[in-house]
């Protein structure tokens, strides 16, 4: 099985909250697609709550589009990581980490402004596979912790696992 890019970085040295360019590629027509690692929690030390990350998934996707989409950027997808330490965001364009971090902070402020659970988009059995597994309060706790901590940048050149380590795993 091929080694995926996300498993070539040292998770023991990742900072959180932090933005990292996980991958960048060009389409056959020359458009740039960038995948960002939006790391909310320090891997293997913290984890996002099940209900909190699910609610955040519904809110974050729209709020990030509000703050980041524009003439040169269009978000394709924002999805939670299976390890529940963050989200991957795929987009057309190549915004800087600082622009992404600013949009992320603004999106967290938007989460705090949601008053009632009924305001969560697609919160119904037709549009959500586990529509009863949500917590606006837990999503707000996550947002508050991100705002309080601020967002750093994780750089691949500082996190890349050596061939020696990879071959020994």
Curated annotation (Swiss-Prot):
Enzyme Commission number: 4.4.1.21
Binding site for Fe cation: 54, 58, 128
Catalytic reactions of this protein: S-(5-deoxy-D-ribos-5-yl)-L-homocysteine = (S)-4,5-dihydroxypentane-2,3-dione + L-homocysteine
Entry keyword annotation includes Repeat: no
A Pfam short name: LuxS
Enzyme class: lyase
Keyword Lyase: yes
MF GO annotations: iron ion binding; S-ribosylhomocysteine lyase activity
Keywords: Autoinducer synthesis, Iron, Lyase, Metal-binding, Quorum sensing
Co-factor note (free text): Binds 1 Fe cation per subunit.
GO process annotations (BP): quorum sensing
Domain of life: Bacteria
Cofactor: Fe cation
Function: Involved in the synthesis of autoinducer 2 (AI-2) which is secreted by bacteria and is used to communicate both the cell density and the metabolic potential of the environment. The regulation of gene expression in response to changes in cell density is called quorum sensing. Catalyzes the transformation of S-ribosylhomocysteine (RHC) to homocysteine (HC) and 4,5-dihydroxy-2,3-pentadione (DPD).
Similarity-based family: Belongs to the LuxS family.
Record text on subunit structure and interactions: Homodimer.
Protein name as annotated: S-ribosylhomocysteine lyase
